[in-house]
Amino acid sequence: MSIYFPIHCPDYLRSAEMTEVMMNTQPMEEIGLSPRKDGLSYQIFPDPSDFDRCCKLKDRLPSIVVEPTEGEVESGELRWPPEEFLVQEDEQDNCEETAKENKEQ
């Protein structure tokens, strides 16, 4: 069993008051957009004629060629994996191989 308690809130408008508000407000058709003072306008949505032009440009991918570089790393350039990491891996591999050889003997 549920008990209903009416909400007593000063901000709450009863339906009759809300109907009165809705009937007395200005219709949206009569509310016009006033031009800006400087007279400049801006477009929110893209122009449909620009859509075809953009689609034609997107059909072709840009041709970017990246060539691998050999030699020293320039200052500030990062490479992965770092050289220190490669040295540590080689040392670990050598240790593992030595351990396997010792077990086999």
Curated annotation (Swiss-Prot):
Residues 18-104 form the LBH domain. GO terms for cellular component: cytoplasm; nucleus; protein-containing complex. Residues 86-96 have a biased composition (Acidic residues). Residues 86-105 are annotated as: Disordered. Keywords: Cytoplasm, Developmental protein, Nucleus, Phosphoprotein, Transcription, Transcription regulation. Its main location: nucleus. It is found in: Nucleus; Cytoplasm. One of its GO terms (biological process) is negative regulation of DNA-templated transcription. The modification Phosphoserine is found at S63. It comes from the Eukaryota. InterPro entries: LBH, LBH_dom, LBH_dom_prot. Belongs to the LBH family. PANTHER family: PROTEIN LBH, PROTEIN LBH-RELATED. Transcriptional activator. This is Protein LBH. The gene is LBH.
